[in-house]
Amino acid sequence: MKRSEINAAIKWSIELLDKNNFKLPRFAYWTMDEWEKNKDKIDTLREVMAGWDITDFGSGKFDEIGAILFTIRNGKLGKPGVGSPYAEKILIFKEGQRLPIHYHIEKTEDIINRGEGTMEMRFYLKKEDGSVDYESDVTYYSDGIPCVAKAGEPVYITRGNSVRLVPYVNHTFGAKMGDGPLIAGEVSKVNDDNTDNYFAEPTA
């Protein structure tokens, strides 16, 4: 993605969060000069990969497959004294935008609808050979309540409600078309997005 596209996405996200009275940590708003001024104080932020991550996952279709993420806090796998003992992120989606289908091996996460539109989720089990199971039903938990969905069936999560995603379950989620953008929250185990995302759709 071009730097101009990334900057525009951050600006739009901040405006959307402000509209919903959701404030990010101070470093979310720093200018390049402020990052330079604080460069001796941000080793932990760098190590736990805190901050903005705007990506189209190599799709070239950001408005369809992509997300605007901000890691508020995280720890470091294998280093319990670094950062926080859990992770928290905000994921912001344009209307109709979603993540590519993927699963995790280590991470368990709660995904919460924090504001604006409706979150649309789809689940698929993983076959023993690693491929996606497009046929079997999936049991999932929404705020502790067990639910069952058919493979690939859209599940709609309204504001304030959440879904727990467990390892080895393929999933995708984003903003339901027709309901506007989405602010989603993620609370999870400490994680490393560079090593624990296994995609079932092409990414780069």
Predicted regions and their residues:
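Double-stranded beta-helix
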Residues: 2, 128-150, 172-204
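Short histidine-centered beta-strand/loop micro-motifs
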Residues: 79-83, 89, 100-105, 110-113, ...
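Short beta-strand His + acidic residue motifs that chelate non-heme Fe in jelly-roll/DSBH
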Residues: 100-102, 111, 121-122, 155, ...
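A short, N-terminal "cap"/entry segment at the start of jelly-roll beta-barrel domains
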Residues: 1-86
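Glycine- and acidic-residue-biased ligand/ion/polar-headgroup-sensing regions
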Residues: 94-95, 107-109, 113-129, 134, ...
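A short catalytic or substrate-binding loop motif that flags glycine-/basic-rich loops and adjacent residues
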Residues: 62-65, 82-84, 93, 104-105, ...
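Short amphipathic
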Residues: 92, 153-156
